[in-house]
Amino acid sequence: MEIENIVANTVYIKARESGGQKKGKSKKWKNYLQFPHYTECLPLKTEIEVTYAFVVEKQPIGKLLFHEFCQATNSQYHQCCQFLTKVEEYETSDDDGQSRRDLASSIVSLLHSKPEDNPSGSQDEQEFWCSFLSDEVISTCITTADSATHDDEPRSDIFTEPYRLTCQYLTDAPFKEFAESMYFHRFLQWKWLEKRPVDKHTFRLYRVLGKGGFGEVCACQVRASGKMYALKKLEKKRVKKRHAETLSLNEKQILQRINSPFVVSLAYAYETKDALCLVLTLMNGGDLKFHLYNLMPGGFDEKRVQFYAAEITLGLQHLHSERILYRDLKPENILLDDFGHVRISDLGLAVEIKDNEPIKGRVGTVGYMAPEIVKNERYSYGVDWWGVGCLIYEMIEGKAPFRQRKEKVKREEVERRVREDQEKYSEKFSEAARTLCRGLLHKEPGFRLGCRRVGRPEDGAEEIRAHPFFNTADTVTGREPVPWKKMEAGKVTPPFCPDPRAVYAKDVLDIEQFSTVKGVRLDATDTQFYGKFNTGCVSIPWQSEMIETECFAELNTFHDEDGNVMWNLRPDGINMDERRNGTSKPGFFSRLFRKKNIEVTKSLHDLSHLGVEQQQPPKTSTQTPAVRSSRAASASGRTLVI
């Protein structure tokens, strides 16, 4: 039994390593990601927004292709893109002061580069790349940036106005030219690949990592790219038996809407004969509950708690900005990735709040539900901030505020403690940590930290981010102010990094298997529901996957070895591909049988020269080469495996 677990872990770890080294691709991955002729993709223009805001600002591949277009066609457009890239780098750069000052100086030098600086160049080279910016905007920006070079911490919004105006300039003529170019046709080809059907053959499956509410969660790998994911199965009969169709579809739709580095992402959704499948971000580092009670019993240090609390706060801020209420914050729902960053997972209880109207419903986990949920009152985003308070308390103290781990106590008693008892603080809490938890665990929602401001739902996170626990240093605990911009960009080094050779999950045989569901039959109405669920790739995660695994860089070629534009981007290229005119290259057996037929015919002619009576050659098959090739391949029993 132990051998089975060792084998499962070894295969899984090897797959993880190959995926990280870009070696997990199938040998035939290029066949799977083969572009069609661009004319086949033109109908997709009616299905997407052909705007700068959508194609360039929201689509990762669209942004790269637009920058390639600008670099290849117009020096002014290219310099605009360079300016935008440098500003984005500046706004998310290290907050140590000097690096930002140096970067600010390099951006200012771009604004100083007027035509007279290069009198020997051509007219195009001398064109002032930012001529669309007024002298006032440029001078104000340069003055502010020059003064910032002497500040300890330069402001992050120095270039906000020229950045906005540069984007506005690129939205007009440059983007219109891009939309008529082969670079946009290539974007449509990527979108065509993105929209292809997904099924179980798209992935390789590995060991079971855990159990969900309706099925197993296992590791999987995309054959075409080698990227690893977590596959969450929802058994169809189990979902139907519990009348959880709406709940399952709700989780899938919310995951599809959210694109946050602090919330697990949905990359694919498809169905098999027995299950609905969600392909999610793989978090190899385990959950906070495992680390808190198995690796660090007694609690984390405040520096580590601050890091996790900050990333969780950003995750909730992203959810709240989409009007999504999470409602199930607890250590087992916070997962660590390979590098130690955390994400919120399991959005099964999440719900959309419409028109900012409070909702009602007793959902959540005992000991983590806010008092208003326990009292069955109406509630809003404040219940999530209560959950953050419970989580911070547990990470510091090593136990939950209203229930100790494995304590045998009735649900009613835990709910009474939540409603009436005041949590107790030990010497483990600094003053800042204590005031933060007390503010988050206030029994009255109107006085709770994160709920005191009247404004947008995401403004509650700003109130928490301004707390001294996140914005002041503490020499005793080693806590430092959180560089929020840097953290949002994922550039803060986590205080703990999981071991890449470890599997932070139960042994395979220790994970209980689901019993067989009996007495449930699937019918036509279920098929309609599955159609809503089975939507294939999710756009942004899929494009990011293509970029991260270098599939984009390897396939995104515009010219062949002879310097000609690729056939699939040429108007006449559709006639160059044999597959488009109904023929295909003869297979091995087709060529072999044809060769045998020719040899027999030649031998008959040779016999006639010897005086032997002439025989009629065998009748030539009327089948087309494509049919012969297809039948020959079928006879051989070969199947295309990607």
From Swiss-Prot:
Keywords: ATP-binding, Kinase, Nucleotide-binding, Phosphoprotein, Serine/threonine-protein kinase, Transferase
InterPro entries hit by this protein: AGC-kinase_C, GPCR_kinase, Kinase-like_dom_sf, Prot_kinase_dom, Protein_kinase_ATP_BS, RGS, RGS_sf, RGS_subdomain_2
Nucleotide-binding in keyword set: yes
Ranges where the record places region Disordered: 612-642
TM ranges: none
Active site positions, chain numbering: D328
Gene Ontology terms describing biological process: regulation of signal transduction; signal transduction
All residue ranges annotated as the AGC-kinase C-terminal domain in the record: 480-545
Enzyme class: transferase
GO molecular function, one term: G protein-coupled receptor kinase activity
Catalytic activity: [G-protein-coupled receptor] + ATP = [G-protein-coupled receptor]-phosphate + ADP + H(+)
Span of domain RGS: 52-188
Keyword presence, Transferase: yes
Family: Belongs to the protein kinase superfamily. AGC Ser/Thr protein kinase family. GPRK subfamily.
Function: Specifically phosphorylates the activated forms of G protein-coupled receptors.
Protein name in the entry: G protein-coupled receptor kinase 1
Taxonomic source organism: Caenorhabditis elegans
Lineage per the UniProt record: Eukaryota, Metazoa, Ecdysozoa, Nematoda, Chromadorea
